[in-house]
Amino acid sequence: MLPEAGSLWLLKLLRDIQLAQFYWPILEELNVTRPEHFDFVKPEDLDGIGMGRPAQRRLSEALKRLRSGPKSKNWVYKILGGFAPEHKEPTLPSDSPRHLPEPEGGLKCLIPEGAVCRGELLGSGCFGVVHRGLWTLPSGKSVPVAVKSLRVGPEGPMGTELGDFLREVSVMMNLEHPHVLRLHGLVLGQPLQMVMELAPLGSLHARLTAPAPTPPLLVALLCLFLRQLAGAMAYLGARGLVHRDLATRNLLLASPRTIKVADFGLVRPLGGARGRYVMGGPRPIPYAWCAPESLRHGAFSSASDVWMFGVTLWEMFSGGEEPWAGVPPYLILQRLEDRARLPRPPLCSRALYSLALRCWAPHPADRPSFSHLEGLLQEAGPSEACCVRDVTEPGALRMETGDPITVIEGSSSFHSPDSTIWKGQNGRTFKVGSFPASAVTLADAGGLPATRPVHRGTPARGDQHPGSIDGDRKKANLWDAPPARGQRRNMPLERMKGISRSLESVLSLGPRPTGGGSSPPEIRQARAVPQGPPGLPPRPPLSSSSPQPSQPSRERLPWPKRKPPHNHPMGMPGARKAAALSGGLLSDPELQRKIMEVELSVHGVTHQECQTALGATGGDVVSAIRNLKVDQLFHLSSRSRADCWRILEHYQWDLSAASRYVLARP
C-alpha cells in the first residue's frame, strides 16, 4: 500500500519538465499515484485538466525515460519518489548552542529512527498525534522538536490517512518563512514521523483562554501577531497555496512575541484560471471560520483565507471565544448570507473591526489581499504613549506617572475636538478603560502632552472630521472598559431577550439557542441586518444639501460625581458618563427620562450611547435619535454619513427600511 500512496515521484517528474502546476490535477482528478496508472490516461483526460498537446508529448517522453531507468526496490525511494535521501545532517555551531541549525535544504532530510526520542503528548489531529521530542544530531547536540506521528491501526496506516500525511510533508518541505512552522525532516519508521520545529509556548488559542492569574495579552502584541500572520499568509498565497484552516488553534507561539502558522493538513494548491481549489467530496472543514462560498460550493481561495483571517482577528480580540457559538453548522451559512457578522469585541478598535468587515465582504473579489492587509494593519494599529500624570478619577483607567499606555482609539465630541477621552490599555496593570487624553504623551509626539485624538490609520470611508477616530467615527464612549474574562456585561434581560449567544442578527424576539459561550453581541451591529430579502424601492435621489446634526456644547464633559448602585444600568462597566447639556447638567430624573425616550426609539442602543448622544445634542431628544440612527446606518454600510442622513430622511427615519436599502446596494 505504501508505494500506491506515495506520490512525490510524480512531483519530481513534473518539475523536471516544468509541468509542476499539473501535479494536483493529475493526482486528484485523474487519480494517478503510480507510473503504470498513466497506461489508463487518455489524451482527452489530459485535455480536461488544461494540459496542451506539446506538454503531453513532454510528459510521455519523461514517462518513457522513467520506465526505462533502473527500478529501485528501496522502500524509501518509492515513498519519496526520487528525492534523494540525505543521511548526513549539518551540525550545530559550537559557539551558538542555543540556536537551531540554519534553514538549508539539506536539513529537510531523512532522519534515523533512533535519533528521535518522543516525550509528552502535545495534541492530536485527524490522522496523527504530536509529541514533544528530542532530536540528536550526529554531532551529539540535542535539539528540542515536535514529532508528528501517523496514526496506525491494527492493519497498518489507512491509505487516505497516509496520503494526507505525505501531502502535508510535501507542502512543508518547500516552505521557509520566519512565521511558518518549519519541517526538519522525516523518520521512515513504524509509524511514519515528521520532525518539526517546536513552538514551546503552545497555541495562541490556549494562551488567549488561559485562566487567571495568567494576564491577558496586550493589545499591541495582538496587533503584532496580526501583522506576522498577514505576512505568513501572503507568503503562502504567493506560492499558490490555500491554508483552509486558519484559526488561533493553528497559530503557535515560538516565543512571547512570535507566532508561527502550523497544521498544513488541509493545505491545497490553487489551480485553474480562477485560482481556487474545489473540494471533490465531503471532508471535515471548520464551519464557523469558513467563507460563504466555501460552505455553499466547497470553493477555497486566497480570498477565503482572508475571510478566515477576519474570524481569527475576532478570536484574538474576544479572548479566544468560539465564533458563532451555539449555532448549528447548517445555519451558519444562512446567517452569513443574511449578512449577519460577528460583533466588534470590546478590545477591538473601530479601525481594526472595519478591516475585519472588509475581510468578510460577501464577494471574494471585494476582500483585500494579504499583501494589502499588511499595510492596512500597520495603519490601523494602536499608538504607544506614556502616562504623564496620575489618573484616579472614578470610572477612569487607573494609571500612574510613567506607565506605558497603548491608545486603542481616541474619541471626542463630534463638534468639540478639544473635549477628548481616549480608550487604552495600561501596560503595567493590563487593564483597559477610558482616560483623559491630557494624561498621556504619545511616543512620537516629542514628549508633548496629547491633546487631540490620534489614529494612525486613514479613514476607510465617509467624510472626515477633525479630531475623530477612524476618520469620522465620532462617538465618545467614556469608561468603556470590557468585562472581566469569563463574565458578561450586565445587560437588562428584556433587551438581551432577542439576542442569541450564537451572535446571529435577529429583528424579532425569539428563543435563544443553547451552546458554547460567546462574547456579548454588540447589538448595534447585529440588529440592523434584515431577516430576509426585502422588496426594495428604487434608489432615492440624494439631494446636494443635507441637514447637519445639532451643535453640542463646547464644554469638557465632567467626571461623574456620584456612583450609582452596581445593578443600576449606569453602574455597568463602560456605562458611567456625565452628559454636558446646554444650560448645565440636567436633573437626574429629567436626564433619565430623556435617556429612556431615546433608548426606546432606537432599537439596540445602550444606556451609555443614549446619554452620549444627548450630551452631543444639548439635550435635544429628536436630534439624538436621528444621530444614533445615522451612526448605526453608517457602521452597517460603506456610505458616508451625509449619504446615510439623506437615505434615512427619504425613508422618514425608518432605520429598518433604510438598512434594507443600503444592504441591497453595498
Curated annotation (Swiss-Prot):
Top-level taxonomic group: Eukaryota
Residues bearing PTM Phosphoserine: S60, S96, S255, S502, S519, S582
Assigned keywords, A-Z: ATP-binding, Cytoplasm, Kinase, Membrane, Nucleotide-binding, Phosphoprotein, SH3 domain, Transferase, Tyrosine-protein kinase
Main location (coarse class): cytoplasm
Tissue distribution: Expressed in all umbilical cord blood, bone marrow and adult blood cell sub-populations and in several leukemia cell lines. Highly expressed in fetal blood, brain, lung, liver and kidney. Detected at lower levels in adult prostate, testis, ovary, small intestine and colon. Not expressed in adult lung, liver, kidney or brain.
Outcome of substituting R339K: In a lung adenocarcinoma sample; somatic mutation
Enzyme Commission designation: 2.7.10.2
Biological process terms in GO annotation: protein autophosphorylation; protein phosphorylation
Compositionally skewed regions (Low complexity) per UniProt: 542-552
Membrane topology annotation: Peripheral membrane protein
Positions annotated as active site in the UniProt record: D245 (proton acceptor)
Name used for this protein in its record: Non-receptor tyrosine-protein kinase TNK1
Mitochondrion found in the keyword field: no
InterPro entries: ACK/TNK-like_SAM, Kinase-like_dom_sf, Non-receptor_tyrosine_kinases, Prot_kinase_dom, Protein_kinase_ATP_BS, Ser-Thr/Tyr_kinase_cat_dom, SH3_domain, TNK-like_SAM
Post-translational modification (record): Autophosphorylated on tyrosine residues.
CDD domains: SAM_TNK-like, UBA_TNK1
Catalytic activity: L-tyrosyl-[protein] + ATP = O-phospho-L-tyrosyl-[protein] + ADP + H(+)
GO terms assigned for molecular function: ATP binding; non-membrane spanning protein tyrosine kinase activity; protein tyrosine kinase activity
Subcellular location field: Cytoplasm; Membrane
Residue ranges of every copy of the SH3 domain listed in the record: 380-445
Pro residues bias locations: 531-541
Ranges where the Protein kinase domain occurs: 116-377
GO cellular component, one term: cytoplasm
Function noted in UniProt: Involved in negative regulation of cell growth. Has tumor suppressor properties. Plays a negative regulatory role in the Ras-MAPK pathway. May function in signaling pathways utilized broadly during fetal development and more selectively in adult tissues and in cells of the lymphohematopoietic system. Could specifically be involved in phospholipid signal transduction.
SUPFAM superfamilies linked: Protein kinase-like (PK-like)
